[in-house]
Amino acid sequence: MYAQPKLTSAEYVQHHMSHWKLNLHNFTFTDGGFWTLNLDTLIISVVLGALFILIFYIVARRATASVPGKWQNAIEMAVEAVDGTVKDSFHGDRSLVAPLALTIFIWVFLMNFMDLVPVDLIPRLFQMGGVEHFKAVPTADPTLTFAMSITVFVLVIFYNFKMKGAIGLGKEVLSRPFGWYLMPINVIFRLIDEGVKPISLALRLFGNLFAGELIFILIALLPWWSQFTLGMVWTLFHLLVITVQAFIFMMLTVVYISLAAESH
């Protein structure tokens, strides 16, 4: 973790917090405002998702009932832990929710884990290929965290309609929490309640990982003799943070779907 000598501290931070952008209007590597695709976020998230699927597939193919290996033990522990958590929170059919929760936890954890990679390593590798900016932590990008939270929001709506039907959901929205006589207020409260969920889900994950990445970058600006000590301390603490944030995102997803699936 070392700073480029030609950059000032402010320029170094700005450089490492900038994305590799694709303008979807003209397909050039420029900022297109709303129509901008962060290629670094897309590449890292897809690669980590593919890695997750590949590892689980290989371990599943080689699974044995006799003497399981280290990878099989680790994956079985993760699957059992997530399934137990889902079982405690979701009391309906878990055939979709449990695999979804496992996928969210592992995928988000892997993306969070990129925050522990030395801040100059991956950007420097891409610079060798002509890419000026590359931000290697997908969950420090609000476009990804909002995309994930909106997907969860869509699932919540789906389960609301599936379990309650259009009429049942309509009655619930119009009559709760203050009764039929205050229908307009009930609708406003429901819109606020549902709208806050994806926003808070996205910003919580983004804020924690963005702050963690920024601290690693600031540590990289310090003298070499202090980088190792502070870097190790922050790495050990941040390892807990990235795990907890992955668990929270998974847990809130399960809770939101469980609340939507409850039949009243």
Curated annotation (Swiss-Prot):
Q: Which UniProt keywords apply?
A: ATP synthesis, Cell inner membrane, Cell membrane, CF(0), Hydrogen ion transport, Ion transport, Membrane, Transmembrane, Transmembrane helix, Transport
- Presence of the UniProt keyword Mitochondrion in the record: no
What's a single GO MF annotation on this record?
proton-transporting ATP synthase activity, rotational mechanism
Its placement in the membrane is given as:
Multi-pass membrane protein
GO biological process terms, alphabetically, are: proton motive force-driven plasma membrane ATP synthesis
Q: What is its main location?
A: membrane
Function per UniProt: Key component of the proton channel; it plays a direct role in the translocation of protons across the membrane.
Q: Which PANTHER family match?
A: ATP SYNTHASE SUBUNIT A, CHLOROPLASTIC
Family that this chain belongs to: Belongs to the ATPase A chain family.
Task: Enumerate the NCBIfam families for this protein.
Answer: ATP_synt_6_or_A, PRK05815.1-1
Assembly notes: F-type ATPases have 2 components, CF(1) - the catalytic core - and CF(0) - the membrane proton channel. CF(1) has five subunits: alpha(3), beta(3), gamma(1), delta(1), epsilon(1). CF(0) has three main subunits: a(1), b(2) and c(9-12). The alpha and beta chains form an alternating ring which encloses part of the gamma chain. CF(1) is attached to CF(0) by a central stalk formed by the gamma and epsilon chains, while a peripheral stalk is formed by the delta and b chains.
Protein name as it appears in the record = ATP synthase subunit a
Which source organism does the UniProt entry give? Answer: Coxiella burnetii (strain RSA 493 / Nine Mile phase I)
Q: What is the lineage of its organism?
A: Bacteria, Pseudomonadati, Pseudomonadota, Gammaproteobacteria, Legionellales
Q: Which gene encodes it?
A: atpB
